[in-house]
Structures are given as structure tokens and as C-alpha cells.
Amino acid sequence: MIRRSIVSFPTMKLKQLESYLSQVAPFENPQYELEQYPTSAHLASRMIFTAANSFEDIVDKHVLDLGTGTAMLGIASVIMGAGHVLGIDVDPGALATAAENLRVVEAEEEMELLHSNVEHISLRPGSFDTVVMNPPFGTRTSGADTMFLNKAFEVATHAVYSMHKSSTREFVLAQGASKGFRGEVDLVRFERIEPLPTDEKEEEKSEAIVF
């Protein structure tokens, strides 16, 4: 089990993180219309490890896991030293699994879960340092990916880590630019340029964009 008190974040190895994340249970009943494709421990560990060590976007940060599902990215953020994590999802079944995952890895104090629709939730602009997410591709509900991106750009003060189909790369980067974020195709990371005033989703078909 994972306890922050016994995990040494500065010396955490990538393979260690992936091993911890292998404890995270996947969706019990994936909702096709919500495009609930699982985020593998392999991919999640690489995204959050990079965010923490290459960009300093996780340790002691206020992190939002948008569309958290079973909390894979949120738990990874906790393990890597996030100050606090909020996970939001519209599916109560997924949140029940997420809550059990938090119990299993003993991360209930560090991560909070909220049942809400991303489109309608009211979050104060700039209320999170970093947003991490594996959003819908928008293949079932047109514009779903844009909705998640817009909410992420609205609430992140510094960086957004998001997974998308490589075929939508230019569109996603343009979305970030329109909101004042510069994106890098990496894993993808978006960094704010100016301060505020069934696994269809395979790794070979997706890439992490960092803003």
C-alpha cells in the first residue's frame, strides 16, 4: 500500500511509480457513450513522472484530475507529491471504483472526489496549479474534447497535461494557443504564457500534450 510518509518522492523511480499504479483497478462497467477508455499504469506513470521531474508541475501543487474515472492520474499525482488533488467525474460508478482505489492505496486524505459534469461545474478561474486528464476523444459526443480543454485552460494557473489522438494534434495545439497556452507534444504539456487577469485509446494512437 502507498503511504506518502514512506514514499521518497525525490528518489521515486519510474518503474516504482508504474508498479504502485498497477494496484489501481480499472472501470468495472465502461460507459461507451462517455468514451471511458482506461489509462494504463504505463502511460499514467510516464505522464505524471515527467510532469513532476521535468517540469516541477506536481510536487506540492494543487492538481485537478478532470474526468478522473478510476483516479489513475490523480493517484499518480498523489504518489509524486501533489499537495492536494481533486478528481471530477460524471459517472458515479467510476467514482465508486475511484473511492475504493483511494482506500486501497491509502490516499483518501490527499485526493478528493467530486461527482459533476465538466460542462456545468463551476470552478474559480485559476484555482489549480496543474490539470491532468485523459479526456474523451469526441468520437461519441462531438466537441467533448474541446469542452474538457476549455475547462482545463480556464482553471489552470500554470500547466495542463492532456492525452489526445495524434490526428488532432494541430487542433489541440491551436485550442491551447487561443487560450494563452503554448503546447508541446511530448508524451502533451501546455504552459500558460501570461498570468491570469476495450482499450480503443491505445498509446500508439494517443499522445500526451503538455501546456
Feature locations, PLM:
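Class I S-adenosyl-L-methionine-dependent methyltransferase catalytic core
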Residues: 2-211
